[in-house]
Structure formats: structure tokens, C-alpha cells
């Protein structure tokens, strides 16, 4: 019979998996407590980094309906539960992994889709949501400005033609 503490912990993990926009699984073997705390600070509120027992995590991912994560839960595992921008969190994890070879990104899940370690790295290479939205807005603005110029050109030509006709009539 499971202990009440473990039942509660599985329920909390299930809730975190279900409510997070993304979750990135890592192997932290060889990292000191100070380095883990440094990683938590680097995530800067975009994600909550938690060291988890694999048996409890497997129960939680089953309960959350994310069974595709089970094969990644081997060896010393920790999970970054992303609440904010997944791109920022992936960048923070990638940068920390580059600086500390002991951190290995195993993979993750984003909005219900399983991500390999390479896909998490590709996510980290994306620009943030704000930058992408600014680029879309800039492109839309350029198209609208070009369209406005096209609509204004015939009006300007008509005005020049009317002025030329008026000048010609004034001469005659």
C-alpha cells in the first residue's frame, strides 16, 4: 500500500505535468546542489526545475495521459515544468547544458507533443514569441503601407492631370 506522502507527491506531479505548457526532462548526474540552484535561477520563473524519482514520475505521466514520456524516465531525472514561454526555458536549459556538460537534455513534451532532445534544441533556437509577433506585425505593416501607396498613386495622378488641364485652359 502506497504511503500518503507518495500519493500526494504523485498527485502534485500529475497536476504539474497536466498544467504546464511544456516539460523538459533532463539528466543531472554530476551536478552539485549549487549548480542545480544556479540552473533554477537561470530559468528565471519561466520554469520550475524539480528532481524527481522515476517511479513516481512514471505514475504521474500515466495519470496525466503522457505515457510517451515514460522511456525518457531512466537514470537520474529532473523535470523543468514550463509555465511561461517554452522558448525562453529551452534557451536557458540549452545554455546551462553548454556551460555544464553534466546536464543532459533527454527530451520533453510541448502542448501534448513529444519532443526529442534535438527538437528541444531546435525550440531553443527559435526567437521568442514577442520577437516573432513583432516580425509578423512589421511584415503586415509593410504590406499595408505598400497597398496605401498604390491607392494614393492614382489619386495623385488625377490631381496632376486636373492641374494640367486647368493650366491649359488658363493659357487659352
Curated annotation (Swiss-Prot):
One of its GO terms (cellular component) is large ribosomal subunit. This is Large ribosomal subunit protein uL10. It comes from the Bacteria. It comes from Acidothermus cellulolyticus (strain ATCC 43068 / DSM 8971 / 11B). Belongs to the universal ribosomal protein uL10 family. PROSITE patterns: RIBOSOMAL_L10. Forms part of the ribosomal stalk, playing a central role in the interaction of the ribosome with GTP-bound translation factors. The keyword Phosphoprotein does not apply. Transmembrane segments: none annotated. Keywords: Ribonucleoprotein, Ribosomal protein, RNA-binding, rRNA-binding. GO terms for molecular function: large ribosomal subunit rRNA binding; structural constituent of ribosome. SUPFAM superfamilies: Ribosomal protein L10-like (SSF160369). The gene is rplJ. PANTHER family: 39S RIBOSOMAL PROTEIN L10, MITOCHONDRIAL. Part of the ribosomal stalk of the 50S ribosomal subunit. The N-terminus interacts with L11 and the large rRNA to form the base of the stalk. The C-terminus forms an elongated spine to which L12 dimers bind in a sequential fashion forming a multimeric L10(L12)X complex.
Amino acid at each position: 500500500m502506497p504511503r500518503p506522502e507518495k500519493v500526494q507527491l504523485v498527485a502534485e506531479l500529475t497536476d504539474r505535468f497536466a498544467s504546464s505548457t511544456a516539460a523538459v526532462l533532463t539528466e543531472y548526474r554530476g551536478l552539485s546542489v549549487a549548480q542545480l540552484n544556479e540552473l533554477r535561477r537561470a530559468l528565471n520563473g519561466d520554469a520550475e526545475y524539480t528532481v524527481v524519482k522515476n517511479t513516481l514520475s512514471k505514475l504521474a505521466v500515466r495519470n496525466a495521459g503522457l505515457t510517451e514520456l515514460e522511456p525518457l524516465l531512466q537514470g537520474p531525472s529532473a523535470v523543468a515544468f514550463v509555465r511561461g514561454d517554452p522558448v525562453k526555458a529551452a534557451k536557458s536549459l540549452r545554455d546551462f547544458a553548454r556551460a555544464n556538460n553534466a546536464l543532459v537534455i533527454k527530451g520533453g513534451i510541448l502542448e501534448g507533443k513529444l519532443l526529442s532532445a534535438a527538437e528541444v534544441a531546435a525550440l531553443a533556437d527559435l526567437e521568442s514569441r514577442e520577437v516573432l509577433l513583432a516580425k509578423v506585425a512589421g511584415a503586415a505593416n509593410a504590406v499595408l503601407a505598400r497597398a496605401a501607396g498604390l491607392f494614393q498613386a492614382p489619386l495623385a495622378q488625377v490631381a496632376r492631370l486636373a492641374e494640367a488641364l486647368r493650366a491649359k485652359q488658363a493659357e487659352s
